[in-house]
Amino acid sequence: MKAGIHPEYHTIKVVMTDGTEYETRSTWGSEGATMHLEIDSKSHPAWTGGNQQLVDRGGRVSKFKKRFEGLGL
């Protein structure tokens, strides 16, 4: 491999929506950084049977619904 063209691979901490923490290796962030997940396998409707609501962060879901409300879907 060529030197100097690959991203740095380091250890980060990931915090799931229920507060569970684990360490993994990633190119995201920097050594020791913490990634807080907004959606994961414990909260995503595809994995929970669709019984939970998606959290509308940044108004994206409401913007989508407003844009397509006249289609009657």
From Swiss-Prot:
GO terms for biological process, alphabetical: translation
Annotated SUPFAM superfamilies: L28p-like
Keyword Ligase in record: no
GO CC, alphabetical: ribonucleoprotein complex; ribosome
Keywords: Ribonucleoprotein, Ribosomal protein, RNA-binding, rRNA-binding
Function noted in UniProt: Binds the 23S rRNA.
Family statement drawn from the similarity comment of this UniProt entry: Belongs to the bacterial ribosomal protein bL31 family. Type A subfamily.
Name of the protein in its database record: Large ribosomal subunit protein bL31
Lineage: Bacteria, Pseudomonadati, Pseudomonadota, Alphaproteobacteria, Hyphomicrobiales
